[in-house]
Amino acid sequence: VIARREERLEQLRKEVNVPLRIFAGDLQKKHVYRQFYTELCQWHPNIRMLVNAAGFGKSGTFSEIAEKGKRIHTDMIDLNCTALIRITQMTLPYMKMGSRIINMASAAAFCPQPSFAVYAASKACVLSFSRALGQELREKSIYVTAVCPGPVETEFFEVSGELKNPLKKLNMAAANKVVH
């Protein structure tokens, strides 16, 4: 499991009943991929499940977001799409028959989202990649699933700036309900 916050990784390890290898690192930092790849080469693990859930979104028109920061759009694509593809590429050689890849997409993948354009496009990428990869890996019995939830109660909406209307919170699913 790769995540930015080591304390959350340790908490996750305590909560699950399966062995986990944890790796603290920010997938927006290039050196993390080299470190992760080096560790994979040393461990030669049998990866039974890969869950790609890293990502973020920013709310606002394309122009408004671009004015806030020149790299916000490309950072979003890098984390939501490129990181997912790179981690999948690195771990796939260590996956055998019956392994699973679960990619977190979003209901936003299914239609354009004004004021959330790049986020929706990035999740459409995740969905399309997952469908195609699933077809490619079918003969190896490695299963790929794209999970496309609607709004989920996480830190996502604080970071995105999307939750300006408190009524939107009424439609949110609890994160543990989506996972189980």
PLM regions and their residue ranges:
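SDR active-site lid
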Residues: 128, 134-180
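Conserved mid-core segment of classical short-chain dehydrogenase/reductases
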Residues: 34, 41, 45, 55-74, ...
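Active-site loop-to-helix junction immediately N-terminal to the catalytic Tyr of the SDR YXXXK motif
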Residues: 112-120, 132
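Active-site helix of classical SDR
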Residues: 88, 122
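Residue(s) in the substrate-gating loop at a strand-loop-helix junction
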Residues: 106
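Rossmann-fold cofactor-recognition segment
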Residues: 16-31
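Conserved glycine-rich Rossmann-like NAD(P)H-binding loop of the short-chain dehydrogenase/reductase
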Residues: 1-11
